[in-house]
A protein has these predicted regions:
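Aromatic-rich, lipid-facing transmembrane alpha helices and their immediate juxtamembrane interface loops
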Residues: 2-331
Length: 331
């Protein structure tokens, strides 16, 4: 039996493109099939008590994997999670998630079924939101990162980068501009604006999609060249598919049909999936952006810690001190 080529298993750029191709080979035919639904099946507005505490209980979709991986799989196999990098990543992302939820939750979402929650209000601009919103983001980030780490350190260990200090020493600085990510992000936002204006003909601006692209692209624009060689792309792709499966089940069959949360149409691109209770395409994109950004941030923090350099020097590069010989030549 022939062995896989070294390029297919070791070229980070090729692996990144393969992840995109894997996602596209599922998304494109699925999108074509869903587009054939010209007249969505009629839906009935359920009574308020149709799903008591539904949103609250559904958080188990994140909590159970966290418990199973964190308290069973990891200890059983003796996996050593880089705890400092893990919790620093979660802290950064959760703070960012809370800030976005505080400022934009009422702009992008609706919550018309309070009976599906504990009815505990959490602060947000424009009015309180269910406390479940903040728990949703916290457990979501932890679940995404824990799944990736478990796959990276155990299930797909063969594709792990074991020598982080060596990789870290190759980098003069972690902060490296990646123009391709910037161009791609601007192109996606431009396409969303054009679609909303010329195809969907719906009023408003695709603010939610713009925010998602920015959230996923900013880490890539800043750190992708540094993170690309150390990302376990197979672990990332499997994490992405697992999270997408969970989120689509969650939103398309439960959250949107039963009003746990909904979407402000003026802030959406205008591309809605009729077969999935009018779910906007942004609901599919959000966890792609979250998974991608989470992994990049985590790997960059691991590289920083492995470099054993101060924060400023690691991210911006140490300023070279001129030698006496160089100074003499200058004089």
């Amino acid at each position: 039996m022939s062995k896989p080529s070294s390029r297919s298993s070791s070229d980070p750029q090729n692996n990144a493109l393969l992840v995109v191709a894997m996602l596209a080979m599922v998304a494109v035919p699925a999108g074509i099939a869903l587009h054939t639904v010209q007249i969505p099946a009629p839906t009935q507005i359920p009574p308020a008590d149709a799903t008591p505490y539904g949103y609250t209980v559904s958080l188990l979709l994140f909590i159970v994997p966290i418990i199973v991986i964190g308290w069973w799989f990891v200890p059983q196999e003796g996996i050593k999670i880089p705890k400092q990098a893990f919790w620093r990543t979660i802290s950064l992302l959760f703070i960012a998630g809370c800030a976005l939820d505080y400022f934009f939750a009422n702009r992008f979402f609706t919550y018309r079924n309070p009976a599906a929650t504990l009815r505990i209000p959490a602060p947000a601009l424009g009015g309180p939101v269910p406390i479940e919103e903040y728990v949703f983001y916290l457990t979501g980030f932890i679940a995404v990162l824990l799944i990736y780490v478990w796959l990276d350190e155990y299930w797909l260990l063969a594709y792990n980068v074991p020598d982080y200090p060596a990789e870290a020493k190759k980098l003069r600085r972690l902060l490296q501009f990646h123009p391709t990510s910037l161009v791609l992000g601007l192109a996606l936002i431009g396409l969303a604006i054009a679609y909303k204006k010329f195809v969907s003909h719906s009023p408003g601006f695709p603010g939610y999609f713009t925010l998602l692209v920015a959230g996923g692209i900013v880490p890539a624009v800043s750190f992708f060249p540094s993170a690309r060689p150390v990302i376990n792309w197979r672990a990332l792709s499997l994490t992405l598919f697992i999270i997408l499966l969970v989120s689509l089940f969650w939103e398309a069959t439960l959250a949107v049909p039963y009003g746990w949360w909904g979407y402000q149409q003026q802030q959406m691109m205008g591309l809605f999936i009729g077969a999935w209770a009018g779910l906007p395409i942004e609901a599919v994109c959000v966890w792609i952006a979250v998974t991608y950004a989470t992994v990049i941030v985590f790997e960059v923090i691991k590289l920083w810690q492995a470099s054993e350099r101060p924060l400023k020097d690691a991210f911006l590069g140490a300023r070279e001190v001129p030698s006496r010989k160089t100074q003499a030549a200058g004089n």
